[in-house]
Amino acid sequence: MQASDSSINTLDGHQVSAGRDESTPLLANSPQRRSSGGTSFGFAVFNLMNAIMGSGILGLSYAMAKTGILGFSALLLIVALLAAYSIHLLLRMCLLTAVTSYEDLGLYAFGRSGKVLVACTILIQNVGAMSSYLFIIKSELPAAIASFLPGAQGEPWYLDGRTLLIITSVCIVLPLALLPKIGFLGYTSSLSFFFMVYFAVVIVIKKWNIPCPLPPLNHTVTFLQAPNISECKPKLFDFSKESAFALPTMAFSFLCHTSVLPIYCELKSPSKSKMQNVANVGIALSFLIYYISALFGYLTFYDNVKSELLQGYSKYLPKDVLIITVRLCILLAVLLTVPLIHFPARKAVMMMFFSRYPFSYIRHILVTLVLNIIIVLLAIYVPDMRSVFGVVGSTTSTCLLFVFPGLFYVKLGREDCSSPQKFGACGLLVLGICIGACSLTLIIMNLA
């Protein structure tokens, strides 16, 4: 390839171009690529949203209760904008360096140590997330199934959490994770998206089925009482010590950065502007679903909202068909997120240990199988999965969402230090360090 006047350096034989236009396709339009077609814009959005939204949606109503409606709205909007901005920095660095992986950005910024650091961070974060999701499946799926089978006697195998975990891992997670391209998961990601939409719709509907003030638990809910006392008045702002514990839930609500570049690579006619539009649409739709479900969940229970939203509905509407089905839908949505997270985790392993070898289906299958076994064993045998990986996740998530994009751009960006881009990257870096330190401190305090 001929070096242009705007090339900035070369590393390991890669030409680094700083003069590309944002609408220029990053990947060459080879005959093989033209025949495969790439992933459509819609499927790319669904995949990104599936990476964004998980079980964390159940904790946002609690976060609103602890920060107030306007406080929550401002914080969630800021987090969404910061997530979009950090994705913008990642895509801009891909344009500058002509590489398409998070690990290689670390390589260009800080050499092999940077590549290993990014790969280890991605692997730890994704293994922790997948194990936590499977732990939720093991803990909650038996109760969800039992709600459809109230007459079950004894302890049948289909109500055993470990058995269900192994079955779902072998029959659902593993086959989907073995797919050669992340774009193929667009179908399951679209299904997961509709599960989340269904969840938000049910939360809105059930606002008018539970009266305020909340009745005694032995009271049959049949009508709406006027919320004319203080406990039924929503708070616009509410910042206290408890508010701080809600911030980590919100800070990581839009974490999808390990999946952004794999989705980018498979996008049909990939360019920075097109992938940025994918990210903007995905984040905007996720914000909308987050906000609607959080708002109506809070307006249903007010200060009595649980840290896991569906617990309140299970108490006051224990036999409601919509609540039973929505719990199952959330579990299925969480389950369908696991294969999507498999892709960047497997890629991190490949980049660390097999980057100099050509692609091999046997290696692809073996690495996927080993990762699947590890996360299943962690979900089965680690008794308090969410607490263990809460500490690790708060650090790795902060790095991937805020610290690395800001730090790498400070190193790789061609602008002056006083430029808006460099200033924004520095701000993102400092903010990420503060959020990570705050989240880690709060989690340790909560465990103590």
From Swiss-Prot:
Glycans are attached at residues 218, 228. Disulfide bonds join 212-232. It is found in: Cell membrane. Keywords: Amino-acid transport, Cell membrane, Disulfide bond, Glycoprotein, Ion transport, Membrane, Sodium, Sodium transport, Transmembrane, Transmembrane helix, Transport. It is a multi-pass membrane protein. InterPro entries: AA_transpt_TM (IPR013057). Residues 1-12, 26-36 have a biased composition (Polar residues). Its main location: membrane. The keyword Transport applies. One of its GO terms (cellular component) is plasma membrane. GO terms for biological process: amino acid transport; sodium ion transport. The chain crosses the membrane at residues 40-60, 69-89, 117-137, 164-184, 185-205, 244-264, 281-301, 321-341, 365-385, 388-408, 425-445. It holds the Pfam family Aa_trans. The keyword Ubl conjugation does not apply. Residues 1-36 are annotated as: Disordered. Probable sodium-dependent amino acid/proton antiporter, could be a neuronal transporter for glutamate. Belongs to the amino acid/polyamine transporter 2 family. This is Probable sodium-coupled neutral amino acid transporter 6.
